[in-house]
């Protein structure tokens, strides 16, 4: 399918990014980013389930809002700050079909205080990915670098990848 056509592209993209030493300190992290990009791609191409971008401190809001239309066409939605407690278990929202649980939740930053929220998402079958300056145990995929600037660039890179895929899929 379409997903396998992307594999050589993803590897080259990730390797080029790594060679520039922009956000990776090891080939292990490169492999993890490659896995995440493939997971996001497969979710967009093969699933009707949404991807949520959870931006806890609103740092990326302006950037992502510029591309809201393109991202929503492929079921990628900006959630913004953390959702209120009880949101995920509110049957009114989810059982009526008003909202669908995402397939993937992409966190711009995850701290130890958000462990329960991550676990609540995982209990609903959501794959949780996060960018941070250190490894976060509760995440399915913890993408981290040794400094915040590299972590920011990594998050922009992933969002840019989602935008690229949305333009490709919609043509």
Enumerate the predicted regions with their spans.
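Ribosome large-subunit tunnel/peptidyl-transferase-proximal elements
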Residues: 1-170
